[in-house]
């Protein structure tokens, strides 16, 4: 059995799990998420925890059980606590402003960049140079953060651009004459 799949997923209070066929749905205080479970993975609910096992013992099935366990664990954390990703804008005149489901960015281009946030993700701007992306789906929150960062990646000479708050930008020295 996969070492990841051996650990059960503990269900905190207020989180509901419903299994219908291969469809697993998780409901919590912050929202609801669904996952199509691979047919070779067996999901067993025992009391306040979920266990995952492969229907047969081959390598691929064990790997799929571990992957499913990790995805369901992220779903449980998402609907109970939520996920967030912080971005920083570094550069003169770089600004961000959240207006509903649209994030307006001034990133040194001749035009403002308007990013439409997908359903289930919200953005806050505590200051003009900080962006806080929140949601229940870990993959979607990370994807949105990566797409916003791709508008203007941090460049290695001055470090200007959009970066994750915990990112360390490798700097280069300018060419010498």
From Swiss-Prot:
Tagged with keyword RNA-binding: yes
Family as reported in the entry's similarity comment: Belongs to the universal ribosomal protein uL6 family.
SUPFAM superfamilies: Ribosomal protein L6
Keywords of this entry: Ribonucleoprotein, Ribosomal protein, RNA-binding, rRNA-binding
Protein name: Large ribosomal subunit protein uL6
GO biological process: one example: cytoplasmic translation
Listed Pfam families: Ribosomal_L6
Record note on quaternary structure: Part of the 50S ribosomal subunit.
Gene3D superfamilies given in the database record: Ribosomal protein L6, alpha-beta domain
HAMAP family: Ribosomal_uL6_B
Organism: Stutzerimonas stutzeri (strain A1501)
GO cellular component, one term: cytosolic large ribosomal subunit
Function: This protein binds to the 23S rRNA, and is important in its secondary structure. It is located near the subunit interface in the base of the L7/L12 stalk, and near the tRNA binding site of the peptidyltransferase center.
Record-level Gene Ontology MF annotations: rRNA binding; structural constituent of ribosome
InterPro entries the UniProt entry points to: Ribosomal_uL6-like, Ribosomal_uL6-like_a/b-dom_sf, Ribosomal_uL6_a/b-dom, Ribosomal_uL6_bac-type, Ribosomal_uL6_CS
Keyword presence, RNA-binding: yes
NCBIfam families, per the entry: L6_bact
């Amino acid at each position: 059995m996969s070492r990841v799949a051996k650990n059960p997923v503990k269900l905190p209070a207020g989180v509901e799990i419903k299994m219908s066929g291969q469809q697993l749905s998780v409901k919590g205080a912050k929202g609801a998420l669904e996952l199509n479970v691979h047919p070779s993975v067996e999901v067993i609910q025992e009391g306040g925890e979920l266990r995952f096992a492969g229907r047969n013992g081959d390598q691929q099935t064990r790997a799929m059980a571990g992957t499913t366990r990790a995805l369901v664990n992220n779903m449980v954390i998402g609907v109970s606590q939520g996920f967030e990703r912080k971005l920083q804008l570094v550069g003169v005149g770089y600004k961000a402003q959240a207006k509903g489901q649209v994030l307006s960015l001034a990133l040194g281009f001749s035009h403002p960049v308007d990013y439409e946030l997908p359903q289930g993700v919200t953005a806050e701007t505590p200051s003009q140079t900080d962006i806080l992306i929140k949601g229940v789906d870990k993959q979607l929150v990370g994807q949105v953060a990566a797409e916003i960062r791709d508008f203007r990646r941090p460049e290695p000479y001055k470090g200007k651009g959009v970066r994750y708050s915990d990112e360390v930008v490798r700097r280069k020295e300018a060419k010498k004459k």
